[in-house]
Curated annotation (Swiss-Prot):
Keywords: ATP-binding, Helicase, Hydrolase, Nucleotide-binding, Nucleus, Ribosome biogenesis, RNA-binding. A motif (Q motif) lies at residues 293-321. It comes from Neurospora crassa (strain ATCC 24698 / 74-OR23-1A / CBS 708.71 / DSM 1257 / FGSC 987). The gene is drh-11. It comes from the Eukaryota. It is found in: Nucleus, Nucleolus. PANTHER family: ATP-DEPENDENT RNA HELICASE DBPA, ATP-DEPENDENT RNA HELICASE RHLE-RELATED. This is ATP-dependent RNA helicase drs1. Its main location: nucleus. Residues 324-498 form the Helicase ATP-binding domain.
Length: 829
């Protein structure tokens, strides 16, 4: 019949396309998904062929093959998984993507922290162009000096050995040949004993003594920490008198009083300004958006979720949960949260989500992120690149110290996001022809409280007046200011205020310790610091200083005492600064000696301890300094050497910590130990000066070589250099100096400003003005002591004396007058 013939034809065609060996089936046929109906049809055909016994042997053999294939397909059809046939990935969804990450620790273990890869391109190109200078290696200078010293001592040793040999030769002539050989060997051994082995044994004995003392000191420190509950009250009672007596003394930083007053309460006028300036509270708390427990609930795109998973972010922090939904709406944001809480991701994630839906036909720069320091910008660039690793979003890093040509080439490609410092951004904005800012849609100010200070006022004003006014602006900081007058500078439009934590709050896992330096012992800071670094905290430590010269001096001292360290401050070029951070991050050095350049935003994994060589100028800087440890839920310790000039900041930090339930304790260090280390440092004072002088000479030599190279290039490439357009700036050198002085005055207070006017000295007139101003600011200028409270004080005795004199003076006066004339009342009677 016709139908049967057609069916046979189909079978014949089907048979001819199948090979005898199933392993040789082409890949395209293997990837095809076979529907269930087709599998059932093949089964019915094979069953019909089984019932026919009059088929040829060849046909029967083929039917058995069809049987096996049909059974396999039937089983596959019954066991079809989520991917289709054979339960394998058909390419519809990436197998590496995970909606719920169970093994969070495994993800975190793979991520080693943020690197500075984004800055290496600019550094390398700058070095090739002759813009980079070699750093003077302090360790190399110390090594050379020790080698010279050892060689000198070796010559003296050789001279003494020759004299000894001559004496032996004269006394023992009979056994000259034998004894000379023996004496040579013995003298060699004795010389080694005298100059090598003896010194080594002395050093070992000293080290053993130090180790024994170390154990004792550690034990005492632990005991003192354990007895804080008992002894702390006594120390505070004893310290109250000294603190109260010193209330009227000169304090270097009177601005701290104003900051504490601002913290205690906001006046009604400022509160009214805030209500008018910020968005209403109802908009700050949308429905359940502040309570999101995972990034999946935020409806983020898959590439963004994959980027978050790659860096180990599985659960949003409070600032992220509150900020991301509001930022996606396009509203202006003023955000604040504790250090190490993920503020960078809080503004990077919504930016990436919005950029995924941008028009891609014409590349355009749409986002600008500004930071106050270069290191923070480099780190922010690393975070953004890592989170956007599964997208096509492009970034450009534009900071000072790196090659201008490399940055101009990247800006010519019109990247989606530019991460920059204010100065370099203005430079490109004015002098790079291919860089346009009229298409900017989002502006972010990281560490905004620092950016809004007087030091950045002119630069920030230049940027804000150039950018489009219809932009979205976001401000973030751990110590976000509440001053509306400052926030107005950023050009915000009804911003949403999001404070995930109270202002100036430290991490809950941070232990804060304070070492009190009694009056007269401020000069022993170096000894205290060396004792701490040698015996208590020996690795993964960041030490903060106020001044670059002190940080550099301690770098030399640490090198002389065999402590591996690196320094980080503004006098270093960018290549040296990056190298220092990377050496500390990779564990090549145990100590990082830094100024406040590294206090903001720097996220280095595994920092165990932060030491403040002296308290910073303000409580806000203290919060940022100690925030370099105890990040992202990890534990950490911050120890501060506090003397009388640091009293204001320390009191503010302790007060804020106690109100938040932070762990605060006082560490007691034996003054004898500090004096011992200080004495050793004082002995090396001449050597320290010589090392600094040798370093200065090497720098001068390098500078001369650079000037010679520059002159050669000026002659060789004169036409090319003269044809370049001159770079312009928006303010003169005088304006730059004024802005710098204003920033320094705001940071260090009025006293330092007056010092700079008088070349480091205060006149008596200025000193009296400052003392009078500080007396007016004090809440109380006098407090009764223990004697007055017990009724035995000088004031009470003075009152008794006055009363006694008043009573006795009256009768004497009357009696005296009467007696002189001899006509008193008694006489008359």
């Amino acid at each position: 019949m016709a139908p049967s013939q057609k069916r046979k034809a189909i079978d014949d065609d089907f048979i001819l396309t199948i090979s005898d060996n199933e392993e040789d089936i082409p890949l395209e046929e293997e990837q095809e998904v076979v529907p269930r109906k087709k599998a059932k049809t093949a089964t019915q055909q094979s069953n019909k062929q089984k019932k026919k016994n009059n088929k040829k042997s060849k046909k029967q053999q083929q039917t058995e093959d069809d049987d096996d294939e049909a059974e396999t397909k039937e089983d596959d059809a019954a066991d079809l998984g989520i991917w289709g046939d054979n339960d394998e990935d058909d390419g519809a969804m990436d197998t590496e993507f995970q909606f719920v990450v169970d093994g969070q620790n495994e993800v975190d273990a793979e991520f080693d922290g943020w690197g500075f890869e984004g800055a290496h391109k600019g550094v390398v190109k700058g070095a090739n162009a002759g813009g980079d200078k070699k750093a003077v290696d302090i360790d190399e200078i110390i090594r050379r000096r020790r080698e010279r010293k050892a060689a000198k001592e070796g010559k003296t040793t050789a001279t003494k050995e020759e004299e000894d040999k001559m004496e032996v030769d004269e006394e023992e002539d009979d056994i000259e040949e034998i004894d000379v050989d023996l004496d040579d060997d013995e003298d060699g051994v004795l010389a080694d004993d005298a100059f090598g082995m003896g010194v080594g044994s002395d050093v070992e004995e000293e080290e053993e003594k130090q180790d024994a003392k170390m154990g004792g000191v550690d034990g005492e420190d632990e005991d003192s920490e354990g007895e804080d509950g008992e002894k702390k009250g006594e120390d505070e009672d004893e310290g109250d008198a000294s603190d109260d007596d010193s209330v009227a003394t000169a304090v270097e930083h009177p601005d701290d009083v104003q900051s504490s007053d601002d913290e205690e309460g906001i006046d009604e006028e400022e509160e009214a300004k805030m209500k008018e300036f910020f968005a209403p509270e109802e908009e700050n708390q949308p429905k359940k958006k502040g309570e999101m427990s995972s990034f999946q609930e935020m409806s983020l795109s898959r590439p963004i979720l994959r980027g978050l998973t790659s860096v180990g972010f599985t659960k949003p922090t409070p600032i992220q949960a509150k900020t991301i939904p509001i930022s996606l709406m396009g509203k202006d944001v003023v955000g604040g949260a504790v250090t190490g809480s993920g503020k960078t991701a809080a503004f990077v994630v919504p930016i990436l989500e919005r950029l995924l839906y941008r028009p891609k036909k014409v590349p355009t720069t749409r986002v600008v992120i500004l930071t106050p320091t270069r290191e923070l910008a480099i780190q922010c660039h690393a975070v953004a690149v890592k989170l956007a690793s599964h997208t096509d979003i492009k970034f450009c890093l534009a900071v000072g110290g790196l090659s201008l040509k490399v940055q101009e080439a990247e800006l010519r490609l019109r990247p989606d996001v530019v991460i920059a410092t204010p100065g370099r951004f203005i430079d490109h904005m004015r002098n790079s022809a291919s860089f346009a800012v009229d298409t900017i849609e989002i502006l972010v100010l990281d560490e905004a409280d620092r950016m809004l200070e007087d030091g950045f006022a002119d630069e920030l004003n230049e940027i804000l007046t150039t950018l489009p006014k219809s932009r979205q602006t976001m401000l973030f900081s751990a110590t976000m200011t509440s001053s509306v007058d400052r926030l107005i500078r950023a050009g915000l439009n009804k911003p949403v205020r999001i404070m995930a934590d109270s202002q100036k709050k430290t991490a809950g896992t941070l232990v804060q310790e304070f070492v009190r330096l009694r009056p007269g012992r401020e000069s022993k800071r170096e000894g205290y610091l060396l004792h701490i670094c040698k015996t208590i905290y020996t690795e993964r430590v960041i030490i903060f200083f106020r001044q670059k010269k002190i940080a550099h001096k301690m770098r030399i001292i640490f090198g002389l005492f065999g402590l591996s360290c690196a320094e980080l401050h503004g006098s270093m070029n960018q290549a040296q600064r990056i190298q220092s951070v990377e050496d500390f991050r990779d564990g090549k050095v145990n100590f990082l000696l830094a100024t406040d350049l590294a206090s903001r935003g720097l996220d280095i994994k595994g920092v165990d301890t932060v030491i403040n060589y002296e308290a910073p100028q303000t409580p806000e800087i203290y919060v940022h300094r100690v925030g370099r440890t105890a990040r992202a839920g990890r534990s950490g310790t911050a120890i501060t050497l506090a003397a009388e000039p640091d009293r204001k900041v320390v009191k503010a930090a302790v007060k804020a910590g106690k109100s938040q339930g932070a762990k605060i304790s006082s560490r007691i260090i034996d003054p004898a130990d500090a004096d011992k280390w200080q004495a050793e440092i004082d002995e090396l004072e001449d050597e320290i000066e010589e090392i600094m002088q040798e370093e200065k000479e090497e720098k001068q030599l390098q500078n001369m070589e650079m000037q010679v190279k520059k002159g050669e290039n000026m002659i060789k490439y004169e036409d090319e250099i003269s044809s370049r357009p001159k770079r312009t700036w928006f303010e003169t050198q005088e304006d730059k100096k004024k802005a710098k002085a204003a920033g320094r005055a705001e940071l260090n207070g009025v006293r330092d400003k007056l010092k700079s006017k008088n070349e480091g000295k205060l006149s008596n007139k200025d000193r009296k003005k400052l003392d009078t101003m500080q007396e007016r600011k004090q809440e109380r200028t006098y407090k009764k002591g223990s004697a007055e409270r017990a009724g035995k004080g000088a004031v009470l005795n003075l009152k008794k004396v006055v009363k006694k004199v008043g009573r006795s003076a009256g009768p004497k006066k009357k009696g005296g007058n009467a007696g002189k004339g001899g006509k008193g009342k008694g006489r008359r009677k």
